[in-house]
């Protein structure tokens, strides 16, 4: 820990709902003091993380009423995707992000209750992802733990036969 890192030329992006976590604030401050360019994507623009970073990008997700912080998580994904789309000049991704509010509104109107039949009585859950879906699987597992109180674990679909399947 606390090893020397060559920070010059480094860009550090930190994503947080509250901007309070010392696990994010300390390295952001360390990188910034070491000459890195630091940016914080936060729901609370006056947070310690925002103060530690050189650039602040408010997420504008609104007040979180739940520990799961789903609005902030979606806002973080969108912010990250917007940065990538602009940086890489990815017109397809930019178009998809422009359409996203309407797509999310349609998804919110759908009847998702059929999932209850699948999940009823479940006390353990595997969430599988791969590639860009792996971080989403990790977050989904966390949401199930936080909101349902069940053992939910995320695994890469590329590795699921080498351990998780042995548990079944």
Provide a role label for each language-model segment.
Residues 1-102, 130, 165-168:
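Glycine-rich phosphate-binding loops that contact phosphosugars or nucleotide phosphates
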Residues 1-12, 34, 121-168:
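Anionic-ligand anchoring segments at beta-strand to alpha-helix junctions in alpha/beta enzyme folds, i.e.
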Residues 22, 110, 135-136:
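Residue-level recognition of alpha-helix initiation/capping sites
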Residues 24, 111-112, 160-161:
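Amphipathic coiled-coil/heptad-repeat helices and related helical stalk/stem segments
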Residues 44, 110, 147:
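Residue-level signal for short amphipathic helical patches enriched in basic/charged
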Residues 83-86, 107, 147:
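Generic structural signal for bulky hydrophobic/aromatic residues embedded
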Residues 96-129:
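Cofactor-pocket helix-loop regions in the catalytic cores of large enzyme subunits
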């Amino acid at each position: 820990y606390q090893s020397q890192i060559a920070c010059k030329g480094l860009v550090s992006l930190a994503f947080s709902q509250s901007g309070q976590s010392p696990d994010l604030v300390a390295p952001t401050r360390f990188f910034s003091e070491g000459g890195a360019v630091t940016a914080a994507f936060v729901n609370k623009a006056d947070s310690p993380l925002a103060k530690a970073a050189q650039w602040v990008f408010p997420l504008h997700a609104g007040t979180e009423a739940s520990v799961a912080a789903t609005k902030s998580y979606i806002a973080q994904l969108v912010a990250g995707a917007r940065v990538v789309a602009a940086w890489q000049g990815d017109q397809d991704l930019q178009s998809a992000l422009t359409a996203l509010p309407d797509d999310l509104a349609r998804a919110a109107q759908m009847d998702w209750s059929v999932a209850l039949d699948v999940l009823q009585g479940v006390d353990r859950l595997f969430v599988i992802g791969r590639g860009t879906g792996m971080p989403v699987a990790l977050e989904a597992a966390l949401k199930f733990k936080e909101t349902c109180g069940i053992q939910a674990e995320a695994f890469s679909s590329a590795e699921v036969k080498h351990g998780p399947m042995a548990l079944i």
